[in-house]
Amino acid sequence: MHDIKAIRDNQQAFEAAWSAKGRSGAAAEAVKLDALLRAAQTALQEAQAKRNESSKLIGMAKAKKDEAEATRLMAEVEHLKAVMASAAQTETEVGGQLRDLLASLPNIPAPEVPAGEDEAGNVEIRRWGDASKLPAGRLNNPKDHVDLGAALGGMDFEAAARMSGARFVVLKGQIARLERALGQFMLDLQTVQHGYTEVSPPLLVKDEALFGTGQLPKFKADLFKTSEQNWVERLDEQIALRVPPLLNITQTDVVENLKGLRAAASMDEQAARWLIPTAEVSLTNIVREQITDEAELPLRMTALTPSFRSEAGASGRDTRGMIRQHQFYKVELVSITTPDQSDEEHERMVGCAEAVLKALELPFRTMLLCTGDMGFGAKKTYDLEVWLPSQNTYREISSCSNCGDFQARRMDARFKKVGEKGARYVHTLNGSGLAVGRTLVAVLENYQDETGRITVPAVLVPYMGGVTHIGGEA
């Protein structure tokens, strides 16, 4: 959420930044709505002041028995009430339009972010690793993870489709164990070596949480939502069946009374919940509507959770295999910092994500995303892309973003600086450390040999109970 005063004072800068993200004209529209809103507020205040003054004069006129003046003033008061009602309506309507507009506008890119329309404008920062030194590097035609998983009897897409539909998978045996080993290894690395605090957060969240991190309202179609009324309606049915005989009343009476009670009472606890698309939502919202002491920052948190995404915008893309799933595990990294700390923390976070790939000896490259390829809430983003032999290319496996105070404003998350009376907005950062499913894909493909046997990366052997190979002698 953006500060309208900042937009008003720096309209050209905001216009240029949003134009780079495909929202040309947004700053002018926001300033126009703001002017209408302030005009309505001024009109309302002026009408209120005049009404109050006229109301006093009515009493004075009546005291002087000046009925004509009293009548005139009363008519003026009625007119002012109409003016106030109109101004109040305009304030409500325009204020809502302005809030909706501001909620829909993306973050402002940092100055060093390259201009570009899509991934073609991204800039490679560095590469690490040599794919030719891994087992798959010696193969002319490496298999993809789907064929490898099926041959090993550990990956079943058909069974998953029968129970859940497309973009799901059933992992079994040593492949399932390898996925679990990867998640545990990543979590241990980020907590023990990198100092992140492990958190076990909710997987179901309210609208406000997703608004805070920027998924709502813009990306509603990408989310899974639970049904909000099913259990309430079933409870109503049972009450309607069981209560009437006890009270000697009709079921219709009970049902009608329940409708009235539910309409009058807060439905907050029965409202729908959303499945988290990433643990970023749960972890970042821990500081929602909180004021954190500066001494506690940076606050670093990590979690290994399932993530749920509808992939509404990915129709036809990556339909084969585990690259793009509705449900997948991911180790998330979140940092809450002061504005002075966030740039350095961003670089540190990228290093923490890279450390996983280095430990697994998986070749990767680090990309700085351009303006047109960055996410909604990010002001600067690095993507890590891992080498996949079957595709002969690099694919995204982590995205690390500095969101500045963009999410903090939406969540009202602030910190108290020593020696200052007021509180400032924190900066929030998030990144994958890493996506477990895609890392599993990379391990299977890069560590395959000509027989389809998989060598377990050395750092994972302790997590695999000493197993060194999958599909052959341990």
UniProtKB/Swiss-Prot annotation:
Pathway this chain belongs to: Aminoacyl-tRNA biosynthesis; selenocysteinyl-tRNA(Sec) biosynthesis; L-seryl-tRNA(Sec) from L-serine and tRNA(Sec): step 1/1
Gene Ontology biological process terms from the UniProt entry: selenocysteine biosynthetic process; seryl-tRNA aminoacylation
A UniProt-annotated Pfam family: tRNA-synt_2b
Residues holding L-serine: T278, A279, E280, E332, S432
4Fe-4S recorded as keyword: no
Keyword vocabulary terms for this entry: Aminoacyl-tRNA synthetase, ATP-binding, Cytoplasm, Ligase, Nucleotide-binding, Protein biosynthesis
Record-listed E.C. numbers: 6.1.1.11
One term under GO cellular component: cytoplasm
HAMAP family referenced in this protein's UniProt entry, alphabetically: Ser_tRNA_synth_type1
Record's comment describing the protein's domains: Consists of two distinct domains, a catalytic core and a N-terminal extension that is involved in tRNA binding.
GO molecular function, one term: serine-tRNA ligase activity
Family: Belongs to the class-II aminoacyl-tRNA synthetase family. Type-1 seryl-tRNA synthetase subfamily.
PROSITE patterns xrefs: AA_TRNA_LIGASE_II
Quaternary structure and interacting proteins, as annotated: Homodimer. The tRNA molecule binds across the dimer.
The name this protein goes by in its record: Serine--tRNA ligase
Function: Catalyzes the attachment of serine to tRNA(Ser). Is also able to aminoacylate tRNA(Sec) with serine, to form the misacylated tRNA L-seryl-tRNA(Sec), which will be further converted into selenocysteinyl-tRNA(Sec).
Catalysed transformations (reactions): tRNA(Ser) + L-serine + ATP = L-seryl-tRNA(Ser) + AMP + diphosphate + H(+); tRNA(Sec) + L-serine + ATP = L-seryl-tRNA(Sec) + AMP + diphosphate + H(+)
Listed SUPFAM superfamilies: Class II aaRS and biotin synthetases, tRNA-binding arm
Residues involved in ATP binding: R309, S310, E311, E396, I397, S398, S399
InterPro entries per the UniProt record, alphabetical: aa-tRNA-synt_IIb (IPR002314), aa-tRNA-synth_II (IPR006195), aa-tRNA-synth_II/BPL/LPL (IPR045864), Ser-tRNA-ligase_type_1 (IPR002317), Ser-tRNA-synth_1_N (IPR015866), SerRS_1_N_sf (IPR042103), SerRS_core (IPR033729), tRNA-bd_arm (IPR010978)
Cellular localization per UniProt: Cytoplasm
Enzyme class: ligase
